[in-house]
């Protein structure tokens, strides 16, 4: 793959009048096959929070710094992040963790204690998102429940990977995160099994680091070390 896919360039748009036919075709065909939802989930959330880490480690709260902070109104600025903090799915979780430490999130915002708040988001002091797989970060807020991406894959599997009452999923994960994924599965699987009248069959595997390969862009510059897929399966 040399560039991202877009509509009509690697991605096909299905006409509305064909949707029901294709859905019916899949649902009938899937009952005659062994369907499994396979999800690459080994990515860490560290890169997602790179800007937050940088700010936490460098911001001192001096007058000149704060002036630059409030003047930067770009969508991905730290000012906008804190201004809209209450809109993030992890907001309630963050408030509760801080409250357990007898810390009031709103008061800390009022006192401009930005790096302290980030410590509760990124480190073991609080949510520890700096050492959390992306699949386990709070992702979608529902009326009485916050789902992670991992949860959403379970829901999707119940909706389109079910044969009889069983839905099969396989996740590739980083070895150090296996216990955390299994803990999350134990916590939410019964909820979704009851909600969707399904029984989950979930397996995990680990990609061996020795299979990592180098990726480059069109300028022959190194992008990352990742890619294909010889996997070590675990229960």
Regions found by a protein language model. Give the residues of each.
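Histidine-anchored nucleotide/phosphate-binding helix
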Residues: 59, 147-162
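Extended, regular secondary-structure scaffolds
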Residues: 62, 165, 177-205
């Amino acid at each position: 793959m040399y560039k991202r896919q877009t509509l009509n360039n690697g991605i096909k748009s299905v006409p509305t009048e064909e949707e029901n036919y294709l859905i019916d075709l899949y649902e009938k065909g899937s009952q005659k096959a062994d369907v499994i939802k396979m999800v690459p989930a080994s990515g860490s959330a560290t890169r997602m929070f790179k800007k937050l880490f940088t700010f936490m480690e460098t911001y001192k709260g001096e007058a000149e710094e704060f002036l630059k902070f409030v003047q930067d109104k770009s969508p991905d600025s730290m000012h906008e992040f804190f201004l809209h903090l209450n809109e993030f799915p992890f907001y309630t979780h963050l408030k509760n963790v801080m409250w357990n430490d007898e810390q009031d999130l709103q008061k800390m915002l009022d006192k401009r204690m930005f790096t302290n708040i980030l410590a509760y988001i990124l480190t073991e002091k609080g949510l520890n998102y700096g050492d959390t797989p992306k699949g386990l970060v709070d992702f979608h807020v529902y009326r009485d429940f916050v789902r992670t991406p991992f949860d959403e894959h379970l829901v999707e599997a119940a909706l389109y990977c079910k044969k009889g009452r069983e839905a099969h999923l396989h996740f590739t994960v980083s070895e150090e995160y296996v216990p955390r994924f299994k803990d999350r599965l134990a916590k939410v699987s019964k909820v979704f099994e009851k909600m969707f009248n399904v029984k989950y069959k979930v397996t995990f595997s680990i990609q061996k680091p020795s299979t990592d390969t180098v990726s480059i862009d069109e300028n022959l510059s190194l992008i990352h070390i990742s890619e294909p897929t010889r996997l070590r399966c675990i229960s």
